[in-house]
């Protein structure tokens, strides 16, 4: 596990005492930028310079932000089922590169697969990473199947430490797993 980051104790104290708005402000103003920096330095060597990223978006923007800022994709697509304004705003605030938001009408296999295929034809690249961390389980399942079918790298942001009472990862313990790499896994 990572050493305690600079603002972790202060953030924890605020959150555990019910000061959730102040805790969230501290987290995104001070703590999260340090998390991003550490995550980038650990995992940026896993990706090519001309990578395309497709992210599944649920209610937590942090994993998308971590992966996007680590990969630094030439094109980035974020797929979601709803426009969650505050979540989208966080992604816009922290993601260094521009991204294309693609809202799908439902989570059926055909809708998700077709949306991914449209992106594939649009980018005309063979270096595609699909981040399956966010999104509904049905989206993640279809994205994983699609990634295997079209030889896309598949990533997942996990964590080593978890704060049960806050239902959040311990800051600084985030891990990037390459779940599937078509050049290695067959």
Identify the function of each model-found stretch.
Residues 1-127, 138-186:
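Long, low-complexity, Lys/Arg-enriched
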Residues 127-133:
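Short glycine-rich phosphate-binding loop at a beta-alpha junction
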């Amino acid at each position: 596990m990572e050493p305690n980051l600079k603002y972790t104790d202060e953030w924890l104290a605020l959150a555990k005492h019910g000061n959730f708005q102040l805790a969230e402000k501290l987290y995104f103003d001070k703590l999260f930028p340090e998390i991003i920096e550490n995550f980038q330095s650990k995992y940026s060597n896993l990706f090519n310079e001309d990578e395309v990223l497709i992210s599944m978006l649920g209610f937590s923007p942090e994993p998308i932000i971590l992966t996007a800022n680590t990969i630094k994709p030439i094109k980035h697509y974020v797929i979601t089922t709803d426009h969650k304004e505050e979540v989208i705003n966080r992604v816009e605030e922290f993601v260094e590169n521009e991204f294309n938001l693609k809202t799908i009408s439902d989570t059926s296999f055909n809708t998700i697969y077709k949306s991914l295929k449209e992106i594939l034809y649009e980018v005309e690249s063979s270096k595609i990473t699909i981040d399956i961390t966010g999104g509904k389980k049905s989206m993640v399942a279809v994205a994983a199947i699609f990634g295997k079918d079209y030889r896309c790298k598949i990533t997942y942001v996990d964590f080593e430490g978890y704060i049960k009472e806050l239902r959040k990862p311990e800051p600084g313990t985030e891990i990037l797993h390459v779940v599937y790499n078509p050049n290695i896994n067959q």
